Amino acid sequence: MSVDGRASIMHRLADLIESNVDDISLIECLDMGMRHESLRNRVIPRGARNFRSYADIAKEYKPRKWHSNTTKNEIQRMPSGISVIITPWNAPFMLSTWKCAPALAAGNSVILKPAEWSPLSASLLGDLIDEAGFPAGVFNIVQGIGEEVGAILVSDPNVNRVSFTGSPEAARHIGKSAAENITPFTGELGGKSPLIIFPDVDLEVAVAKAVGQFDDSGQICLAGTRLLVHSSIKKEFLNRFLELTAEQKLGSSFDDETEITPMIHPDHLQSVAGFVDRARINGDKVLCGGRVFKDDKLWYEPTLIEPVSNQSEVVQKEIFGPVLTLQTFDTESEAIELANSTEYGLAGMLYTKNRGIAERVGRAIRAGTVWVNCFLIRDLTAPFGGFGLSGIGREGGDYGIDFHSDLKTFQILDDSLSE
């Protein structure tokens, strides 16, 4: 199929996603608990944007051509074959579209393995892909337990690419299996992102952004879970933070006024609670929250912890729940040192009115994406990925399609061919 043909079907699929937003949002909300309003108005529509963006990027691609010495040269981008896509349980529909779209745009066949905790929307995506007109066999879904089904997929020698989003622990196993067949592998592996607040900010805005990191009960890989606040404003910041956090409503994902939604699974809630329990034993100070909400099995109170040291587990490990840490700094260099002091490097945020501070600190943060005075604003043509333990490879724009492609250098000797 031509690039134009693929792009046309991908735009048709985007139309179908937009016309089925209500159904997809309902299924996704029931399956993994994200707030229905967010799904309906932002997250699921982003899935349509993913397909439109990659359809257009593929159409606009122009192979590089040049002449050197005695040859005409061209770089050709070709489908690599079969792409295995393994997605996580948080925002599964959107992340499935984000990871499958570049593979389909490249001309590959796709095998999607969704997370077992939130499998439903993947099947709906398959139905929409069939309705859009993709040829039979181009898009395939395999449901099952990751350690069993996923292991078989990534170790198959017929697979040409593996793209994974999930934990570093799982990525190590997947990477080793893929390496046996020299299968290219890319992984987005989570984060422990700093949110740095300088003393010149509008404190109301900064506090609101900090409390906003509890969205989706903290089950967002990009969340700024490490609050780094200038020591001169710590007291005022903390007072306002605690006041606003106390106002957060824990409730149903179908209630538009809910701020703290249920967690994905009781097992995950227990994992989050374990981090907080160990923090108390370690001597870290729990400033708010720190317990299951009304003995429920799915809600955990929004929690802020002041660690005894930067080496505390709650500072260094990804918790993936409504748990933030609070640390202070006095100088730019100290803020940078704290920001870069974990093994992760997915994202970073900083709030300041000073351009010099923004430029210096922003450039010094080792992370795949750095936001200044904003959060979660995405340009889908920009590269997305992390430093260190946050991943390997990049998605987004041509970077995503290139991963799922084989690049060939094609050279013709001057005056060696007749018409």
Language model feature labels by segment:
Residues V3, V21, L203, K234, ...:
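Residues at or immediately preceding the N-termini of alpha-helices
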Residues E18, K62-V205, F329:
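Rossmann-like NAD(P) dinucleotide-binding subdomain of oxidoreductase/dehydrogenase enzymes
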Residues D15-D22, G33, E37, D56, ...:
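Generic secondary-structure signature for well-ordered alpha-helical cores
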Residues V159, I196, K249, V276, ...:
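Conserved C-terminal structural/oligomerization subdomain of aldehyde/semialdehyde dehydrogenase
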Residues F51, A122-L125, L153, I174, ...:
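Hydrophobic packing residues within well-ordered alpha-helices of enzyme cores
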Residues E169-S309, V372, S418-E419:
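ALDH superfamily catalytic-core signature
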Residues M1-T71:
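N-terminal Rossmann-like NAD(P)+-binding subdomain of aldehyde/semialdehyde dehydrogenases
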Residues R6, E28, F51, G107, ...:
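Residue-level signal for inorganic ion chemistry
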